[in-house]
Amino acid sequence: MPGFAFVRDVSYVEFLDRVGREEQRLRAAGVWDVPHPWLNLFVPRSRILDFEAGVFRGILRDAKPAGPVLMYPMNRGRWDGRMTAATPDGGEGAFYAVGMLRSAVAAGDLERLERENAAVLAFCDQEGVGCTQYLPHHASPDGWRRHFGEKWGKLTALKRRYDPRGILSPGQGIFPAAAGGDEAGSDSL
């Protein structure tokens, strides 16, 4: 993508630690303890140019990111189908991980970044880009069902098997606690 590509050769360890280095930079500047409304998406390979046009050249064209924006291809063949991570539908051999790891450094940044994130998600939904969020937050169990799609049944089976008392990660709201408190045994799964 013209204007967005740059190459920097780094060691494998430096690549793996790229976000940690950003944290160190922000800590040194005294701005690590600010909100980080990060947005991480998996975008189908066939739609990455539509995403680039609508998001980077559209919604975010005038944005000055305070933090790294990462984009790199992922080989679908390296993802084990037993994993519960939601990846884009389709038979494409690759998809892109897009991470907008921005920080709300100045006054008003948090609200602006959250609006931009919402606009990115709305664009992807309206244009049928078919992206999925990585590490999302959904306000309802129904949102989580839509997020996991065909993997929802598998996820609920794993929850019943490994957390039958429903005590792990209750704050995420993926599985609402049933009236009796035994969420893993409830019909809501």
Predicted regions and their residues:
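C-terminal substrate-recognition/cap domain of FAD-linked oxidoreductases
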Residues: 1-116, 135-137, 145
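Generic, well-ordered alpha-helical scaffold segments in large soluble proteins
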Residues: 51-58, 123, 158-161
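Activity-critical C-terminal alpha-helical subdomain
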Residues: 23-30, 37, 127-189
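Short amphipathic alpha-helical surface patches that serve as generic macromolecular interface elements
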Residues: 95, 114-121, 152-155
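Secondary-structure transition/capping motifs at alpha-helix termini
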Residues: 58-63, 126-127, 165
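Long, well-ordered alpha-helical scaffolding segments within enzyme catalytic domains
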Residues: 109-131
